[in-house]
């Protein structure tokens, strides 16, 4: 199993208070062919961290946004993961599941009925694999895992198990305890971006939870949520001590291109309108996302990781970042796989 692990970074020293472990996996579409291949890939990164003595009962491992969403091709024919584009990958899925797809399509109320119907008809299988893999990994390594995010309809965590429901699709992140159970609360993305809005519903910022972990009180802000002051106000009100930001941004070379402003919702009042087009994408993340806003929540430690890989035509080159006691740190955008360890 090739991890494409180009970078391992350690910040601080072990003070027996635990650590935030940012895992930036380099995923291939074939990694989603089965539950076993998905498990093996993520297991490889955790095993690499264990070999560096970076895992302990107070470790919180953080994985990127949409990591679980591509389980939509789970169990499908090789055409799905061998396709050159995401649209072509979806075609054999629709053909093989024609009846449930049509049923979902007829009842869909989303603007993008096709995307919504595909994810909704595969939701049970996706949720089961997501739960099984991260539960098993949390137990195997005895750590807390922020399982990136996954698209599911009306999801909930019942008895430590993630279950899809009937209703709108949400982009959610689950936190798995060292005993393998999912925390009863889910972090639901409050600010889907423009490309998500046609089929992904918005959560409420006021419902964002904080998770009790052995390393401290953890807040999880899914990608674009980290750009909005309301999210940090919620974290402050719940006395968060750590913040994790699972992210995914599409576009090769995007990080160094001019920033296109806020997407999917109005820019907050504290944003300089002139920054759109003046800042690069990377500079905007530095100024307006985790690194620029975490202090407003009274939080000193945070990590932001992005999904990298060869996933059809969904190319991404973005830089993971860490905040440690008010000091920010960026990794190179050229990195494929990376482990970023922040001792608390």
Q: For each predicted feature, which ranges?
A:
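N-terminal glycine-/serine-/threonine-rich phosphate-binding loop
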Residues: 2-53
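Active-site-proximal beta-strand elements of phosphoester/diester hydrolases
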Residues: 15-35, 62, 186-189, 216-225, ...
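Short catalytic/ligand-binding loop motif for oxyanion handling, primarily in non-cytosolic enzymes
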Residues: 30, 69-73, 153-157, 252-254, ...
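Well-ordered, non-membrane alpha-helical segments in soluble/globular domains
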Residues: 34-48, 91-99, 120-132, 264-292
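Cys-nucleophile CN-hydrolase/nitrilase-fold catalytic domain and related Cys-dependent amidase chemistry
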Residues: 47-177
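Surface-exposed cleft-lining segments at the edges of enzyme active sites
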Residues: 116-126, 190-196, 218, 276
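Active-site catalytic loop in hydrolytic enzyme cores
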Residues: 131-132, 151-242, 251-268, 282-285, ...
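CN hydrolase (nitrilase-like) catalytic-core segments centered on the catalytic cysteine
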Residues: 132-146, 164, 223-340
């Amino acid at each position: 199993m090739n991890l494409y692990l180009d970078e391992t970074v350690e910040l601080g020293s072990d003070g027996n208070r635990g650590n935030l472990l940012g895992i930036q996996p380099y995923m291939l579409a074939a990694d989603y062919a089965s539950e076993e291949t998905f498990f093996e890939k993520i297991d490889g990164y955790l095993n690499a961290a264990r070999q560096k003595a970076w895992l302990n009962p107070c470790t919180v491992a953080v994985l990127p946004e949409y990591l679980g969403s591509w389980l939509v091709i789970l169990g499908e024919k090789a055409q799905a993961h061998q396709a050159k584009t995401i649209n072509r990958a979806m075609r054999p899925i629709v053909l093989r599941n024609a009846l449930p797809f049509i049923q979902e399509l007829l009842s869909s109320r989303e603007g993008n009925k096709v995307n919504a119907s595909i994810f909704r008809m595969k939701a049970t299988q996706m949720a089961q694999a997501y739960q099984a893999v991260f539960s098993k990994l949390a137990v195997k390594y005895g750590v807390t895992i922020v399982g990136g995010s996954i698209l599911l309809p009306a999801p909930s965590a019942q008895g430590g198990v993630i279950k899809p429901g009937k209703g709108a699709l949400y982009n959610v992140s689950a936190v798995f305890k060292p005993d393998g159970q999912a925390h009863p609360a889910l972090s639901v993305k409050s600010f889907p971006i423009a490309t998500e809005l046609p089929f992904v519903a918005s959560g409420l910022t006021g419902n964002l939870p904080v998770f009790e972990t052995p390393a401290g009180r953890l807040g999880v802000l899914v990608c674009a949520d980290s750009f909005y002051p309301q999210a940090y106000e919620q974290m402050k009100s719940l006395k968060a001590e750590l913040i994790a930001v699972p992210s995914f941004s599409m576009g090769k070379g995007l990080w160094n291109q001019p920033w296109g402003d806020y997407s999917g919702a109005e820019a907050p009042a504290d944003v300089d309108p002139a920054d759109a087009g003046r800042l690069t994408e990377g500079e905007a993340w530095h100024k307006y996302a985790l690194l620029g806003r975490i202090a407003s929540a009274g939080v000193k430690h945070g990590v932001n990781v992005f999904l990298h890989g060869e996933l059809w035509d969904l190319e991404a080159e973005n830089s993971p970042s860490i905040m440690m006691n008010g000091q920010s740190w960026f990794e190179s955008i050229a990195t494929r796989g990376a482990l970023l360890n922040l001792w608390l």
